[in-house]
């Protein structure tokens, strides 16, 4: 995520990175959902305070994105114009389900889902209908050959750096449309 944040910044997209308490404390077991969503809300408030004049989009990688969506489903996140998910974890590995997406119908801002075709935590055959159900609020951008961390197989001929640039360009273009 650090490289992604750096590349987004280079493209003119400011980022605020944060960690959940369990990560800060180097624990393996995640905090309770209430703690995770409260952390998201606190991070959004900090971003608004630090950069009140910038357009604000919230999101994250994997569980960070899912917890951001859960916080947004509980009520609007002040100042947030849209949500960006880098590898939305739709289900645990090898246990396909859409239950983790049930709350997304309560999110009221546009959502960008960035997913790799080799993502073990999001079967695209399940994610596509989830996004379709969300209608114009959901945009799905698929990265051919990328895994959950957006890494590519060497034999693909596409570098991780190229994928990173693709993600940055997609986020920038999508955010520009939302700001209009």
Q: Model-flagged regions — what are they?
A:
Residues 133-152:
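Catalytic histidine neighborhood in serine/cysteine hydrolases
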Residues 117-119, 145-147, 155:
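Acidic beta-to-alpha connecting loop that harbors the catalytic carboxylate
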Residues 154-180:
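Catalytic active-site module of serine/aspartate enzymes centered on a nucleophile-bearing elbow/loop
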Residues 120-126:
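Conserved alpha/beta-hydrolase "acid-adjacent" motif
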Residues 40-109:
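Primarily recognizes the serine-hydrolase "nucleophile elbow" in alpha/beta-hydrolase
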Residues 107-108, 113-115, 119:
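Short beta-strand/loop motif that positions the catalytic acidic residue
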Residues 15-17, 83, 140-142:
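Conserved beta-strand scaffold positions in the cores of enzyme catalytic domains, especially
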Residues 1-56, 70, 150-157:
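Serine-hydrolase catalytic machinery in alpha/beta-hydrolase-like enzymes
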């Amino acid at each position: 995520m650090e490289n992604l944040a750096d590349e987004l910044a280079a493209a003119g997209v400011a980022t605020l990175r944060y960690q959940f308490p369990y990560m800060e404390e180097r624990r393996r077991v995640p905090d309770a959902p209430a703690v995770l969503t409260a952390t998201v809300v606190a991070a959004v408030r900090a971003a608004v305070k630090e950069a009140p004049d910038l357009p604000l989009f919230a999101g994250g990688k994997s569980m960070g994105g899912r917890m951001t969506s859960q916080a947004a489903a509980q009520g609007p996140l002040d100042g947030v114009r849209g949500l960006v998910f880098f590898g939305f974890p739709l289900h645990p590995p090898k246990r396909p389900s859409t239950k983790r997406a049930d709350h997304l119908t309560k999110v009221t801002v546009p959502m960008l889902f960035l997913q790799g075709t080799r993502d073990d935590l999001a079967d695209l055959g399940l994610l596509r209908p989830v996004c379709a159900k969300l209608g114009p609020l959901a945009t799905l951008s698929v990265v051919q050959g990328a895994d959950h961390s957006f890494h590519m197989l060497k034999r693909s001929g596409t570098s991780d750096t190229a994928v990173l640039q693709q993600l940055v360009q997609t986020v920038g273009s999508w955010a520009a449309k939302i700001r209009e």
